[in-house]
């Protein structure tokens, strides 16, 4: 009898875990990127699939294209540009990154010359949040895309005047 109780309890727990895992999977729209062009030579296609969220109009996505580099105390960034392009006939957009991965840096003196690993990026950009379509990027093979979700802090506040 004790064995049956343990077996039933285990079954209920496993079913609950399975259902919660399914719910997590169902929070994403079906990924469809076949209509996007193939990456050109020396580039790769990467994408961000955003989960379904409440009030998506309130959210933004800030994305960073860059690479881990060993840097000193100077401010560094990667030279290049990000152009938003459209998939012909579909009305979908993607981001094409044009960069050779070269860095520009300030020229401050760094007395200890201690280098640390840091994610060095092109100028970050912000786009609207849309869980129905992936954010597709074409980037040089030696770069990567990282992102964060920007959420409103609170209700709107009024500006003051003199």
Where are the regions a protein language model picked out?
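Bacterial Sec-dependent N-terminal signal peptides
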Residues: 1-23
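N-terminal, charge-rich interaction modules
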Residues: 23-83
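Extracytoplasmic
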Residues: 43, 90-92, 132
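Mature extracytoplasmic domains of secretory-pathway proteins
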Residues: 56-123, 127
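C-terminal partner/receptor-binding element of secreted or periplasmic proteins
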Residues: 128-162
């Amino acid at each position: 009898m004790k064995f049956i109780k343990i077996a039933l309890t285990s079954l209920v727990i496993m079913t609950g875990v399975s259902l919660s895992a399914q719910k997590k999977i169902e929070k994403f729209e079906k990924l469809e990127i076949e209509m996007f062009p193939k990456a050109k030579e020396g580039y790769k296609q990467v994408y961000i699939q955003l989960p379904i969220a409440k009030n998506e109009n309130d959210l933004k996505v800030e994305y960073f294209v860059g690479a881990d580099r060993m840097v000193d105390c100077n401010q560094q960034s990667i030279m290049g540009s990000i152009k938003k392009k459209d998939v012909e006939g579909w009305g979908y957009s993607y981001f094409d990154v044009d960069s050779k991965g070269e860095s520009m840096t300030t020229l401050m003196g760094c007395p200890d010359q201690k280098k640390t690993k840091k994610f060095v990026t092109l100028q970050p950009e912000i786009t609207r949040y849309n869980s129905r379509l992936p954010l597709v990027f074409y980037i040089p093979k030696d770069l990567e895309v990282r992102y964060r979700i920007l959420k409103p802090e609170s209700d709107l506040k009024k500006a003051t005047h003199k």
